[in-house]
Structure formats: structure tokens, C-alpha cells
């Protein structure tokens, strides 16, 4: 019996090795030209974020056919089905420099606006799946360090209990902190400052939470060490 069990284990290990080798041999990342299909021939600009909802739909964040949405009437938040078929888009005229996006467990779409111009930007906006604005954090066009202002927020995520975590800052003279809010948008706390020391940030670029609500903030490629 022990010998048979050992043979089964060896067979499983061998199978795992073969599968791992096959996966490793695949091109990563791979590219599929023409996946996104627009009915009006729209061309995409700089794509800053992408996420997938629970139904398998793909959400993309486009900088309005260019690298900025300032003065544009193009809708930057785009929804595709799993085959790349265009479903809807929204957010036109609301964002300056869309950067981070997060689709929460209820299907709401969160977007960060990491710049400011003409009285817009430096905000985090929560949209419903059909494009209604449900919540706005930060003061439009006003950079700052207070509990109700941001300076170039780069990313947003929500924890399993609905709490909101925002990576506030995008290099330069912007902020370098994590800001936490209740699910209703009430300020809870903020931490971090611009520094290369452990637990601090020079340039924030992405954020995520695990099942326990622990936040993970990522620096850009030049500073790959994450903070937890």
C-alpha cells in the first residue's frame, strides 16, 4: 500500500513538473490584436488601468484617445465583455488624468484622477456599473494634504468589509501616503510620507488588499519593494 501511494505521489509530482514546464514555455505576456471592438471606430489612447468584474466583463481606463482627458468629451471608463465586444462607456468630462481603477465586489467602478486642471482632478470617484456617480472623495482641482484633499492620487482599492484605501501621490511634489476611509467615505486614518525608509514611500503607484483587509502598496519599477 505504501509503495502504491509513493508511486501515486511521484506520478503527481511528475505531472506538476510537466505542466509547470509547459506553462513556463508560453509567451508571457501574450498579445491579441483587435480584441477590443468599438462600434464607432474609436481609437484608444494611453491605457492606465484594467480590471475584471465578477461576471467576467473587462473594464479599461483610457486617457480619452491621448494621454490626458482635459477638455475632452470622450468617455474614459470603458466596459467590454469577455470577447472584447464594447458594452458601454462613461465618465466624459469628469476626469483630467485617469490613473487607477478598481471594480469592487458589488460591481461599482472606482477611478483615481491623478492630476488637476480647470477645477477638476485630484479626486477619487465611485461610479455605479451604469455610470452614475455614487461617491466623490477629495476636492475637485484642489491638491492638498488634509483629510479631505489629495495630491495626485494614483490608485484605489476596497477591503472585503468595504473600507476604502487610496494610494495618494504620484511622484514629484505630490503626496506619498495611504489614506483610509469607511465604506461611506468617512476619513479614518492616513500614514506614510515621502522617504526611502522602510514603511515610507517615494512614489506610490498601486494598492491592493487581501482577505483580511491588509493593504499592500506598490512602488513603480524603479522601486519594486512593496510596503505592507
Question: What is each PLM-predicted segment?
Answer:
Residues 23-228:
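Eukaryotic scaffold repeat domains enriched in small/polar residues
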Residues 9-20:
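Bacterial N-terminal signal peptides
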Residues 8-9, 45:
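Short beta-strand-initiation
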Residues 1-6:
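N-terminal secretory signal peptides that target proteins for export/translocation
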Amino acid at each position: 500500500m505504501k509503495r502504491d501511494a509513493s508511486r501515486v505521489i511521484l506520478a503527481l509530482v511528475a505531472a506538476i513538473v510537466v505542466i509547470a514546464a509547459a506553462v513556463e514555455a508560453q509567451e508571457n505576456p501574450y498579445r491579441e490584436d483587435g480584441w477590443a471592438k468599438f462600434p464607432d471606430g474609436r481609437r484608444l489612447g494611453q491605457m492606465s488601468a484594467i480590471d475584471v468584474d465578477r461576471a467576467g466583463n473587462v473594464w479599461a481606463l483610457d486617457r480619452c484617445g491621448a494621454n490626458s482627458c482635459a477638455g475632452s468629451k470622450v468617455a474614459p471608463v470603458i466596459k467590454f465583455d469577455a470577447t472584447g465586444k464594447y458594452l458601454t462607456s462613461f465618465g466624459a468630462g469628469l476626469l483630467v488624468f485617469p490613473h487607477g481603477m478598481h471594480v469592487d465586489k458589488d460591481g461599482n467602478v472606482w477611478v483615481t484622477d491623478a492630476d488637476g486642471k480647470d477645477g477638476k482632478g485630484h479626486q477619487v470617484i465611485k461610479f455605479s456599473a451604469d455610470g452614475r456617480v455614487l461617491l466623490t472623495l477629495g476636492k475637485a482641482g484642489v491638491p492638498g494634504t488634509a483629510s479631505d484633499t489629495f495630491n495626485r492620487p494614483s490608485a484605489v482599492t476596497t477591503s472585503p468589509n468595504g473600507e476604502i484605501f487610496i494610494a495618494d501621490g504620484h511622484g514629484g511634489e505630490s503626496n506619498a501616503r495611504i489614506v483610509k476611509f469607511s465604506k461611506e467615505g468617512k476619513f479614518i486614518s492616513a500614514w506614510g510620507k515621502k522617504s526611502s525608509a522602510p514603511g515610507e514611500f517615494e512614489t506610490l503607484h498601486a494598492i491592493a488588499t487581501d482577505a483580511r483587509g491588509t493593504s499592500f502598496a506598490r512602488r513603480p519599477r524603479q522601486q519594486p519593494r512593496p510596503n505592507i
